[in-house]
């Protein structure tokens, strides 16, 4: 018993020691886990801070100029700016004009910018932006209106009245605006083709080639609302039977071709929506008739912007790319007709209408090439489209067509627009535009006066800045001789432009003669010890790269 007590005491002490060791281990583990938790939290917080980009890191083009936040639903307006959709709607509702003042007349979804923003957010592990609701947008615009006093805006009716006074002549016209001049349904693609002077350019270009207007008397105006017959046509357009759809399309095509007032009454949101769904039909006859109907509807000036805003341009571009031959003819006519409206020019370029037109101007039928060329002429009146044409390689292609005598008159009209723009002018100089124009002028007996005048207009545009590069290229191509001929025997406007180009070139010749005829005292020059300054003087430039003394 005495021996067992010490053993029991040892066992108790040992168990207490084990408990204390276990307790200390638990405390140490708990402490380590706390450190791990705190470290993980700090690291996660730091990583989250790193993943959330600041406003300075967000690309400026992703931010709405009005709200200053990342755009969830960006749209592009006629002036070329991109905004959040809700902000634009609020501005139009409240009559607010931000700075710089944009053009909100045409609103197009900017899908490319939207996808770019989402891709950027995914790469940065940043949540994509949510669309701004209308209430928040109006609250934001009201706050901006309080800061910026607004001038009294002219109402829409007043704008239309003022514009009508400016546009309409004082004489009474008996024909519609779209009936100013009939263009032929074919053209001669050789170098002998006849092109009207630039003063009559717009008279050539008021109708697509695929439209032929019948001779008819004055037609009574229809009611603005759809009649029961028109409602029946709309019902047939939505039918599941192809025969009924074709019957309705042929009927609408005939009505809108004869009755001008029906173009307005039938150009409603419901009708355009039904036509839009039929453009991509797999039946060629349906596609042809739909595009023909759109040609007729687009002839009315008030319908042009409405048709573009309906979103019908992208499917038309698809037809230009892969539709039937006849459908391509009509689609080119629709694009040309819509491009006559200034508000549509930027939108058509943004939606990708330039590239298929450039393709069809070379390989399409005569009607397609004709309307494609005139569509490109009107679209190239906008600077943003001229920049796109340069990127698409249009300058080299168009100059090649001029050299080969293909559609030379219509192509020169496009090149005149390109030569007048500082964005596209360098591309013309790089691609041999000066030499090409002088070469056409040398074919004096083969080209008509309009073609010669267009060539001189291109040279005049290229000489606008009076750069040494143009002067050198013109002198190398011996342009002076051909311009002198135009100055003596050309039309009055061609004479004036040729005279101005010659003044630029003659100034270059006089400068060169002055340098060549200058007497130089070489002995005095060598004794002066200032050779570098004399070298700069001899070079005719203010500074010289190799100006070190020798």
From Swiss-Prot:
Keyword Transferase: yes
Region listing for Disordered, in residue ranges: 19-55
Pfam families found in the cross-reference section: Arm, U-box
Chemical reaction(s) catalysed: S-ubiquitinyl-[E2 ubiquitin-conjugating enzyme]-L-cysteine + [acceptor protein]-L-lysine = [E2 ubiquitin-conjugating enzyme]-L-cysteine + N(6)-ubiquitinyl-[acceptor protein]-L-lysine
GO terms for biological process, alphabetical: protein ubiquitination
Keyword Repeat listed: yes
EC number: 2.3.2.27
Record key words, sorted: Repeat, Transferase, Ubl conjugation pathway
Known function: Functions as an E3 ubiquitin ligase.
Protein name: U-box domain-containing protein 40
Organism: Arabidopsis thaliana (Mouse-ear cress)
Gene name of the encoded protein: PUB40
